A protein has these predicted regions:
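The canonical Cys-X-X-Cys-His
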Residues: 10, 28, 39, 66-69, ...
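An amphipathic alpha-helix signature
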Residues: 7-11, 15, 36-40, 105, ...
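Electrostatic cytochrome c docking/interface patches
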Residues: 47-72, 161-167
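Short, structured interface segments
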Residues: 30, 35-54, 150-155
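A cross-kingdom feature marking solvent-exposed beta-strand/loop segments within repeated
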Residues: 22-24, 132-137
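Flexible gly/pro/ser-rich segments immediately N-terminal to CXXCH heme-c attachment motifs
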Residues: 1-4, 27-34, 57-61, 68-72, ...
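Gly/Gly-Pro-rich "capping" loops immediately C-terminal to redox-active cysteine motifs
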Residues: 1-10, 30, 82-111, 126-129
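Periplasmic/extracellular electron-transfer cofactor-ligation site
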Residues: 19-22, 71-93, 117-120, 159-164
């Protein structure tokens, strides 16, 4: 969790019970706020990936292309995921718009390439198996550029209500 979640989000989850998956019956317990800053820091330290630390999110990525990739004519992420408060077409799991608030870029970049490596048993497929894009006509099929474009689109995404649900 320390390499995946931004420190601010981790602190919110631990101290306030903030969540983005209201469909789950289980959740993290809310902890005494006096221990949250140290625990959040300790979790990040314990999960530190030194080889990831110098990575910074892309600054100039094609957010419009990222939205295309997220949509039904692209990788169809919106088939399963909520996006900007809109339900997924078949399921309505985690709203992708919260990614910018929750996730660290280095983790996100690696997760998209191989979700099963991070979450064995996940239903989320890899859209870049063996480094080859499922959408070769978008951004010349370049894996790094496509993932950067998705990240850019998520940085601009809106969530109605703008606050995740507390317990």
């Amino acid at each position: 969790m320390g390499a995946k979640l931004r420190r601010e989000w981790l602190s919110q989850v631990l101290g306030e019970g903030t969540r983005v998956r209201p469909y789950l019956a289980t959740h993290m317990p809310t902890l005494d706020r006096t221990v949250v800053p140290a625990l959040a820091g300790d979790l990040r330290t314990a999960d530190r990936r030194e080889d990831w630390e110098s990575e910074v999110p892309p600054r100039e990525a094609a957010a419009a292309k990222g939205r295309d990739l997220l949509g039904g004519d692209g990788l169809a992420c919106v088939t399963c995921h909520r996006f900007e408060g809109n339900p997924g077409l078949l399921m309505s799991v985690l709203d992708l718009a919260w990614s910018r608030t929750r996730l660290e870029w280095p983790w996100f970049r690696r997760y998209l390439v191989d979700p099963a490596a991070f979450r064995p048993g996940t239903r989320m497929p890899s859209f870049w198996p063996e480094g080859h894009s499922a959408m070769p006509d978008i951004l010349e099929g370049d894996t790094a550029r496509q993932i950067a474009a998705i990240w850019a689109a998520l940085q601009e995404a809106r969530v109605p209500g703008a606050e995740p649900a507390p317990y």
